[in-house]
């Protein structure tokens, strides 16, 4: 039987999302979701939303949500692009700012969707090795000959570049676009790089509502950059679908931004739990990277990471294991509630002892 698939569809290796098994009630620490529900503002607004309006298309420009983001960050709405999750925006970046066959630079250990997009859009990826401690050497990113993607904090390591380090990369690539993927920036100890977009026209900063604003199920993200870059993203978007953001997502995004105190409180809870968990795991002999995200990246000399992942799964806890040779002795653990992380640590203790 003829397959009807294109060569690309037959050959590409797609992104592998975190597993979501249904066979038992797992403690889910594998997909970097928030352990806390969305803001009560979001719940109230969705319940009270006009059901009849769902017969109407949403605003293709997402103007009301843009206004909220612009006010929060003290920027112009013309400098904002909103997408159906930051992953969609990242995909649009690969299409808007690169031609087929172009080089594209990013770390050899980072968000694996970058490699998928490079393959999908026929770009030549150049993976720059991290240092032995998994940190980025910014000197490796100076005076390159094409665009750069940097996740900050990086994934799955959780390690962070400072704003000064990022600015040095941007300054030394004036003819290349630099895209900073800030999916986890709200859990870090530094400000977002968005302020640098006012100084540098080659910088685009991408963020998401999925992590720190507890809206992974809504699929909402945004980018900040100069009007030329934003227009490029719009050109790609409107060539696919004018209405990528649905009415309920817009409502949820607006209310999540309005409730800034809830946002701060839940982020601080995650940070506090993360730091407490780091200490406990170090006491158990784990190598714990200094993650500034809502997850930690850990290994132990006495147990192979895949075995630890499988034993935790058997005990009802899901974590993320990567088969890549460079990181196959580490697991990534999403930060849950204090109660969930206490259970995680107790299960870890049992596994190590036995």
Swiss-Prot record:
GO MF entries: histidinol-phosphate transaminase activity; pyridoxal phosphate binding
Keyword Amino-acid biosynthesis: yes
Catalysed reaction, written as an equation: L-histidinol phosphate + 2-oxoglutarate = 3-(imidazol-4-yl)-2-oxopropyl phosphate + L-glutamate
Assigned EC number: 2.6.1.9
Biased composition (Basic and acidic residues): 1-11
Record has Amino-acid biosynthesis as a keyword: yes
CDD domains: AAT_like
InterPro entries assigned: Aminotrans_II_pyridoxalP_BS, Aminotransferase_I/II_large, HisP_aminotrans, HistidinolP_aminotransfase, PyrdxlP-dep_Trfase, PyrdxlP-dep_Trfase_major, PyrdxlP-dep_Trfase_small
Sequence positions bearing N6-(pyridoxal phosphate)lysine: 211
Alphabetical UniProt keywords: Amino-acid biosynthesis, Aminotransferase, Histidine biosynthesis, Pyridoxal phosphate, Transferase
Positions of the UniProt region annotated as Disordered: 1-33
Pathway the protein contributes to: Amino-acid biosynthesis; L-histidine biosynthesis; L-histidine from 5-phospho-alpha-D-ribose 1-diphosphate: step 7/9
Entry's Gene Ontology BP terms: L-histidine biosynthetic process
Cofactor: pyridoxal 5'-phosphate
Subunit structure: Homodimer.
HAMAP family for the chain: HisC_aminotrans_2 (MF_01023)
Family: Belongs to the class-II pyridoxal-phosphate-dependent aminotransferase family. Histidinol-phosphate aminotransferase subfamily.
Listed name of the protein: Histidinol-phosphate aminotransferase
Organism: Brachyspira hyodysenteriae (strain ATCC 49526 / WA1)
Taxonomy of the source species: Bacteria, Pseudomonadati, Spirochaetota, Spirochaetia, Brachyspirales
Gene of this entry: hisC
